[in-house]
Amino acid sequence: MQDSLKDILLTFSFISRLPVKLGELSDWEVRMKRIPAYFTIVGYIPGLIYFTGSFLSLNFGIIAPLLSIVLGFYLFDLFHFDGLLDTLDGFLNQSSKSRRLEIMSKGNVGPFAVFYGVLYVIVFWELITSIEPVAFVFGSVFGRYTMDVVLVFSKPAKNEGLGAMLFPFNRFLLVPATLFTLPLLLIDVKLFLVSIFSSWLVGFLISKVSEKQIGGVTGDVLGGSCLIGQIVVLLILNYLI
């Protein structure tokens, strides 16, 4: 139990900005390969932050959703947003695989990243002020689940970096990652099934596109897949609830 708790804390330290104190971990690299099992746990916190902002927007206007986006992105989603922007700049560049990887590793914001990044924020804002608040819990959890799906179908594009540390990926980790999504099944069966299907579809497509564009996945691609999965789930649920 204590060992699993350390893995969960490591997961939070890896994919969020929460100030987590881990102490000395002699088996850090081994634990890193286990953290995908807990990605979906992390998703509940930003989901509840966005849920609160969306719910309070009925009484507090734009202030509540604005603050929730600022907090949610600062603590959780900016890390993935950076990966999304780098991925867009790399994938949409008409060049070789090695050149795309170079563009992504430099992290310079190009025109593709600016345009689609702004578009993402606009769509997210429109949703948080109009959609049923509970959709954000589904979106955030299954956005993280999408990263697990990407790992199932992928290989590392390079032998270094954050993404490479998660390989070789143990597919058994998908079992606990899926189990941690089951509380959402109690909220709404239909929304759960639609969300998990969307995550699998988006994750599979991203893995195949990434393999074609750069020969595998990187940490940027994994981070970007989280937000792509999240926004796809939100857009679909927008028409269901």
From Swiss-Prot:
Q: In which pathway does it act?
A: Cofactor biosynthesis; adenosylcobalamin biosynthesis; adenosylcobalamin from cob(II)yrinate a,c-diamide: step 7/7
Q: Report any Pfam family annotated for this entry.
A: CobS
Q: Which catalysed reactions does the entry list for this protein?
A: alpha-ribazole + adenosylcob(III)inamide-GDP = adenosylcob(III)alamin + GMP + H(+); alpha-ribazole 5'-phosphate + adenosylcob(III)inamide-GDP = adenosylcob(III)alamin 5'-phosphate + GMP + H(+)
UniProt membrane topology term? Multi-pass membrane protein
Name the cofactor(s). Answer: Mg(2+)
Organism's domain of life?
A: Bacteria
Task: Give its E.C. classification number.
Answer: 2.7.8.26
Asked if the Swiss-Prot or TrEMBL record annotates the protein with the keyword tRNA processing, the reply is no
Going by the UniProt record, its keywords in alphabetical order are: Cell inner membrane, Cell membrane, Cobalamin biosynthesis, Magnesium, Membrane, Transferase, Transmembrane, Transmembrane helix
InterPro entries linked:
CobS
Which EC main class describes this enzyme? Answer: transferase
Q: Where in the cell is it found?
A: Cell inner membrane
Q: Give the UniProt record's GO annotations in the biological process aspect.
A: cobalamin biosynthetic process
**Can you tell me where the transmembrane regions are?**
34-54, 55-75, 109-129, 133-153, 165-185, 186-206, 221-241
* A GO-annotated cellular component: plasma membrane
One of the record's GO molecular function terms: cobalamin 5'-phosphate synthase activity
The reply on keyword Lipid biosynthesis is no
Role description: Joins adenosylcobinamide-GDP and alpha-ribazole to generate adenosylcobalamin (Ado-cobalamin). Also synthesizes adenosylcobalamin 5'-phosphate from adenosylcobinamide-GDP and alpha-ribazole 5'-phosphate.
The similarity comment for this entry is:
Belongs to the CobS family.
Q: What is this protein called?
A: Adenosylcobinamide-GDP ribazoletransferase
Species source reads: Fervidobacterium nodosum (strain ATCC 35602 / DSM 5306 / Rt17-B1)
Please state the gene responsible for encoding this protein: cobS
